[in-house]
Amino acid sequence: MAQPGKLLKEQKYDRQLRLWGDHGQEALESAHVCLINATATGTEILKNLVLPGIGSFTIIDGNQVSGEDAGNNFFLQRSSIGKSPENLLDNDPSFFCRFTVVVATQLPESTLLRLADVLWNSQIPLLICRTYGLVGYMRIIIKEHPVIESHPDNALEDLRLDKPFPELREHFQSYDLDHMEKKDHSHTPWIVIIAKYLAQWYSETNGRIPKTYKEKEDFRDLIRQGILKNENGAPEDEENFEEAIKNVNTALNTTQIPSSIEDIFNDDRCINITKQTPSFWILARALKEFVAKEGQGNLPVRGTIPDMIADSGKYIKLQNVYREKAKKDAAAVGNHVAKLLQSIGQAPESISEKELKLLCSNSAFLRVVRCRSLAEEYGLDTINKDEIISSMDNPDNEIVLYLMLRAVDRFHKQHGRYPGVSNYQVEEDIGKLKSCLTGFLQEYGLSVMVKDDYVHEFCRYGAAEPHTIAAFLGGAAAQEVIKIITKQFVIFNNTYIYSGMSQTSATFQL
């Protein structure tokens, strides 16, 4: 019987448990997130992380609370003005090593570069967030982020009808569609129907699978001919056959290893296994060895089938064929894991059965995201010019907003303030900001043109942090933090820019 506390938790987090499961929720509840600066953006991020149940937070804000802060931050009151909030920042850089993720909001460029360097060397993920007028900006800095459960949209079913394993082939052969009672005929799973007619198709086409549109239409006609006829010669209403006809494309997908998985297999981290190798790469190496041996060039069977029209008995039997094969494949991968762990002097239990099963059932969807460091992005010789210049084919591309943010940071470095922070400064700052933009583009060798309209607009922003933009960015940032912590779904790589002017967004690898 389930414990009352567990039931309460399931009721409280029902929706999100459907997204990332118990193990994802456990990761969130054991996470420790550091938020630097409780600005409007920071507060929105915090709110969106508190609600899903993040375990603990540390907020670092060394600034005095001002009237502007009280207006931006709904956690502060007017009575807070003039009082200094608790300073949780320890000057020792190792202070940051305790956190699962660090989120930095509204930090100046010089501070960001120092912080990013510390976290990069400690391999602590950093998410930079910034609201500047009607512009939202996020940058993820993480050396390596492996994802087992990427949850791809429109994932293809793993049915193996083009390469049936022996147990599946034997199961298909147990059906004789030509000598069935009407009830059994109309309750045969569509996977079996397609497999039976595929065998007939092979015999007529020298084993060639239907590939072209015409071939697939001919194959559908072949299935259609198998629908039972009544005494008047009219086709019976057999929904399972109609379901088979609709699922021809799904069923005839080629069983192959995705290129993204091949890239993982060919990665140095997968080839060279040491005692320091993370569990993901040990599992990936074991998977690679399984493919080369027991899998005969194929990944482990996923072990799931879609819902379909069939009687319970037939459906469960078919489901069990796939499930048993999935268990058998997972056990084979597990043997490779055990041998690898032994070879590097690691305990067999250092990789759990749960991790193993999770990897095998998601073996076609593994992802590894590697972001560039902030130092590389800001380096004169390492800046990604190609990404910027190619994006500037459209003069209103969101990359322009990135260039403007770099320009206002240069303005801040030169003048000790952001452009247009006071109304009387807006006009005089236009020329100064344009000069900063020109200097930045020349220094980095970026031969692109930015419209004067953007310079004027950024001066009018006055470094304001409108709550509408902060709220949007807070939700988006919290989503990325959750992805990082749960290691589920795929984070963007590596820069995200939102334009409140056009209500569009884009990602760039900078």
UniProtKB/Swiss-Prot annotation:
GO terms for biological process: apoptotic process; protein neddylation. The keyword Acetylation applies. Pathway: Protein modification; protein neddylation. Ubiquitinated by TRIP12, leading to its degradation by the proteasome. The modification N-acetylalanine is found at residue 2. PANTHER family: NEDD8-ACTIVATING ENZYME E1 REGULATORY SUBUNIT, UBIQUITIN-ACTIVATING ENZYME E1. This is NEDD8-activating enzyme E1 regulatory subunit. It comes from Macaca fascicularis.
